[in-house]
C-alpha cells in the first residue's frame, strides 16, 4: 500500500513527459570491437621500458616508442598504478593512441583519487581522439584484457563527459552501461542530472530521472535536491514544495540546501511571503538557517524595496553568529543605492571594510552609479580611484556607468577618453557602452560620427539592439532626417531586431516636428499591427503634433482616446492642448483646461503660462482663478 501511495504522489511529476523510454537513444551503428595489439612481450624495447618505469629511470626510456609497445608495458604494469601514473605524466599525450589511453585509464582508476584517470579521459575528449561510443568500447576491452572487475571506470567516463560539458555523451554512456547489464553509481547519475540542469535542458533531466527510477537506482538527498531545483527553474514552485513531502515519504530528511533551493525560487519570483513560510517550516523541523538562507531573504526583500526588513534580517543574521559575506553586503548596498539612500549604502560599505571583508567591483558599481545620478561627479571619480587603490579593477559595468554619466553631462571628450581607457585595459565594450556614445554624438549633432560608431559595433562582433537603434533614430529625427530614420526601421526588420514603443514614439515625434501629423497617426496603427501597445507618450506626441498645426479636433480626439485607454493626461498633454487653443485664439477653452489641470493636481509650469500669455496677449487678458 505504501508503494501505491508513493507512486500516486509521483504521478504529478513529468516522469515520462514526451519520451518513449523504450526507444533507444543511440542508433545501433556497426562498430569494430576493440582489439589490443599483441606485440612480442619479449621485445627488448618493451623490457627496457618496463624496467625504466619500475626504477624511475626516465632518462632510459627510448624516444621512439610505438603505441603498441606502450600498451604492452602498461599491461605488464597493471598492478602498479603509481608507476603508470608517473610514466603517463612524463609522456607526451600525442604518443598515446586509444588502446593505450584506455589501458592507462583502467589502471589509474585503481588509485585512491579518480583525478588522474579523469584528467586522461578529459584530454582524450578534448583532443577528439574518438567518439564517446568508441571510448566506451575501448575501456570495456581494456577492462577485459586486464581482468578488471570494477565498473567505476565507466562512471569516470560519465563524469568526464559532464566536466567537458557534453552531458549527451554521459547519457549515452548511461544507456551503454544498461545494455551491458551494468548500472552507474548514483553519484554519476546526480552529476549527469546537474550537468543537464546547468545546460538549462530540464527535459533531459526529467528523462534521466525517469530512467533512474525505472532502473531502481536508489536516489539520495542530493538527487531530490537537484530535482527540486529543476522544478524551481521551470517556475513550478508549488510542485517543488510538494517534492519535499515526496522525498520525506521515501525516508529522506530535507536539508538546509533543500529549503534554500525553494526559498531561492520564491524570492526570484517576488513571492517573499511564501519564502517566509518556508523559513517557518525549517524552524519547525529543526533545520537551522545558514548564511545563504539569510542572504537569499535579504536579496528578495531588497528586490521588493523592503529595505528596512532586509536590514532587520541582516541584523538577525549577525546576532545569530552568522558571518555575512561580500555578496550580502553588496545586496544591501545596491538596494539602498536604488532608493537614493547613499548615506546608508556607504555605511554598509564602511562596515564591511571594518570587519575585514574586502569590497568587490559589485560593491563600488552601485555607489558610483548613485553618485552620478545625484550629480556628485567628483565624488564618483574619487570613488573609482579608491576602488583601483584597493586593487579592484573596474569592469565593463563600471565603465558603462562612467561613460553614460559623462554622456548625460554632455562631456563627450571625457566619455571617449574613458572608452579608450576601457579598451586599452582589455575591458571589452558592450552594447550599453556604444549606445551611450551614439546617444551623446546624436545629441551634439555629430551624426556622421554616430553612424560610424554604429557601424563599428558590427565589426566588434556585437549585435545592435533596440536601444542602440532607438538612439540613432532619435538623432536623425531630431535633425529632421526622417528618410534616414525610416531606413533604420527597415534595417531593424532585416536584422530581426523588434522595434518597441520608444522606436515608434520617436518616429511619430520626428514626423510631427516636420508637420506630418497625419503620417504619424498612421504609425499608431502600424505599431498596433505589430502587437506593440501605444503608451501615454504615443498619445501626447500626436496631441502635440495636431495642436502645433492648430488642428484641435484631432488633438482632442486623441485626448479622448487616451482617456478611454486608461491613460491620465499629463502636464505635457495640457500644455500641448493649451498651446494649440491659444494659437487658434480660443482663450476661453484654454482657461477651462487650465482650471481642469489644476483641479487634477497638475501644477502648470513656465511653458503653460508662456503659451497663455502669448496666445492671449492681444485678447481680453487672463482671468486668474482657482489659485492660478
Model-derived features: positions:
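N-terminal targeting peptides
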Residues: 1-222, 231-242, 246-249, 270-274, ...
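Pentatricopeptide repeat
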Residues: 66-70, 97, 101, 117, ...
Amino acid at each position: 500500500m505504501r508503494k501505491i501511495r508513493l507512486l500516486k504522489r509521483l504521478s504529478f511529476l513529468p516522469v515520462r513527459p514526451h519520451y518513449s523510454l523504450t526507444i533507444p537513444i543511440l542508433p545501433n551503428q556497426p562498430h569494430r570491437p576493440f582489439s589490443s595489439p599483441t606485440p612480442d612481450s619479449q621485445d627488448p624495447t618493451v623490457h627496457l621500458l618496463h624496467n625504466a618505469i619500475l626504477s624511475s629511470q626516465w632518462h632510459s626510456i627510448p624516444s621512439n616508442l610505438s603505441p603498441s609497445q606502450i600498451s604492452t608495458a602498461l599491461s605488464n604494469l597493471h598492478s602498479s598504478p603509481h608507476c603508470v601514473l608517473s610514466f603517463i605524466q612524463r609522456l607526451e599525450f600525442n604518443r598515446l593512441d586509444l588502446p593505450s589511453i584506455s589501458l592507462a585509464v583502467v589502471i589509474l582508476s585503481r588509485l585512491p583519487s579518480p583525478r588522474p584517470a579523469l584528467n586522461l579521459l578529459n584530454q582524450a575528449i578534448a583532443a577528439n581522439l574518438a567518439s564517446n561510443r568508441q571510448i566506451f568500447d575501448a575501456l570495456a576491452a581494456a577492462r577485459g584484457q586486464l581482468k578488471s572487475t570494477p565498473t567505476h571506470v565507466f562512471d569516470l567516463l560519465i563524469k568526464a563527459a559532464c566536466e567537458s560539458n557534453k552531458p549527451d555523451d554521459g547519457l549515452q554512456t548511461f544507456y551503454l552501461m544498461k545494455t551491458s547489464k551494468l548500472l552507474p553509481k548514483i553519484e554519476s547519475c546526480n552529476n549527469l542530472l546537474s550537468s543537464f540542469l546547468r545546460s538549462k535542458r530540464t527535459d533531459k533531466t526529467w528523462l534521466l530521472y525517469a530512467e533512474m527510477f525505472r532502473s531502481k537506482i536508489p536516489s539520495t538527498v542530493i538527487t531530490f535536491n537537484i530535482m527540486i531545483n529543476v522544478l524551481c527553474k521551470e517556475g513550478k514552485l508549488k510542485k517543488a514544495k510538494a517534492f519535499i513531502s515526496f522525498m520525506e515519504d521515501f525516508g529522506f530528511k530535507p536539508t538546509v540546501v533543500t529549503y534554500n533551493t525553494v526559498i531561492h525560487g520564491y524570492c526570484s519570483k517576488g513571492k517573499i511571503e511564501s519564502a517566509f513560510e518556508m523559513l517557518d517550516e525549517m524552524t519547525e523541523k529543526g533545520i537551522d538557517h545558514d548564511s545563504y538562507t539569510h542572504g537569499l531573504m535579504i536579496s528578495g526583500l531588497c528586490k521588493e524595496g523592503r529595505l528596512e526588513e532586509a536590514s532587520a534580517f541582516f541584523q538577525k543574521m549577525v546576532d545569530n553568529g552568522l558571518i555575512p559575506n561580500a555578496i550580502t553586503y553588496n545586496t544591501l548596498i545596491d538596494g539602498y543605492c536604488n532608493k537614493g539612500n547613499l548615506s546608508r549604502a556607504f555605511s554598509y560599505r564602511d562596515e564591511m571594510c571594518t570587519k575585514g571583508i574586502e569590497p568587490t567591483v559589485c560593491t563600488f558599481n552601485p555607489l558610483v552609479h548613485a553618485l552620478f545620478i545625484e550629480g556628485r561627479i567628483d565624488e564618483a571619480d574619487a570613488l573609482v580611484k579608491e576602488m583601483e587603490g584597493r586593487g579592484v579593477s573596474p569592469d565593463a559595468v563600471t565603465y558603462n556607468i562612467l561613460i553614460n554619466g559623462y554622456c548625460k553631462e554632455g562631456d563627450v571628450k571625457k566619455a571617449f577618453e574613458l572608452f579608450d581607457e576601457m579598451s586599452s585595459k582589455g575591458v571589452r565594450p558592450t552594447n550599453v557602452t556604444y549606445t551611450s556614445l551614439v546617444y551623446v554624438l546624436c545629441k551634439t549633432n555629430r551624426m556622421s560620427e554616430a553612424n560610424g560608431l554604429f557601424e563599428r559595433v558590427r565589426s566588434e562582433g556585437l549585435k545592435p539592439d533596440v536601444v542602440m537603434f532607438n538612439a540613432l533614430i532619435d538623432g536623425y529625427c531630431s535633425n529632421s532626417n526622417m528618410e534616414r530614420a525610416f531606413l533604420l526601421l527597415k534595417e531593424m526588420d532585416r536584422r530581426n531586431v523588434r522595434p518597441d514603443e520608444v522606436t515608434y514614439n520617436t518616429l511619430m515625434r520626428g514626423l510631427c516636428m516636420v508637420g506630418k501629423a497625419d503620417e504619424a497617426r498612421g504609425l499608431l496603427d502600424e505599431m498596433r499591427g505589430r502587437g506593440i501597445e501605444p503608451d501615454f507618450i504615443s498619445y501626447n506626441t500626436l496631441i502635440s503634433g495636431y495642436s502645433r498645426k492648430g488642428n484641435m479636433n484631432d488633438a482632442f480626439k486623441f485626448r479622448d482616446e487616451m482617456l478611454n485607454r486608461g491613460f491620465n493626461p499629463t502636464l505635457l498633454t495640457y500644455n500641448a492642448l493649451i498651446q494649440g487653443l491659444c494659437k487658434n485664439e480660443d482663450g476661453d477653452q484654454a482657461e477651462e483646461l487650465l482650471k481642469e489641470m489644476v483641479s487634477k493636481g497638475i501644477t502648470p509650469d513656465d511653458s503653460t503660462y508662456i503659451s497663455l500669455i502669448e496666445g492671449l496677449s492681444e485678447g481680453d487678458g487672463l482671468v486668474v482663478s482657482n489659485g492660478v
